[in-house]
């Protein structure tokens, strides 16, 4: 099952997070209505808030994430990074950003 179908089946809307739990937790943040659209900063920020809440719920205190919101989504990394710092790192979630 693809990511889109997985999130669709979970009935997740923009600003929410779909969670897949097998050997490890995988969080899919929903930042836009369609894959070809650009997310707004408000939707991105709301999705990061939802990610924080899911981390609390599942006692997850460390995340490894790609450079989300950039590249195809065309958000500025400096802005995205500040949202991640304010909404995750300053609240006790350790975040490691990796590059693919």
From Swiss-Prot:
From which domain of life does this come? Viruses
Q: Name one GO biological process term.
A: peptidyl-glutamate ADP-deribosylation
What InterPro entries does this protein map onto?
Answer: ADP-ribose_metab_enzymes, Macro_dom-like
Alphabetical list of PANTHER family matching this protein = ADP-RIBOSE GLYCOHYDROLASE OARD1, PROTEIN C6ORF130
Return the protein name: Uncharacterized protein 032R
- Lineage of the organism: Viruses, Varidnaviria, Bamfordvirae, Nucleocytoviricota, Megaviricetes
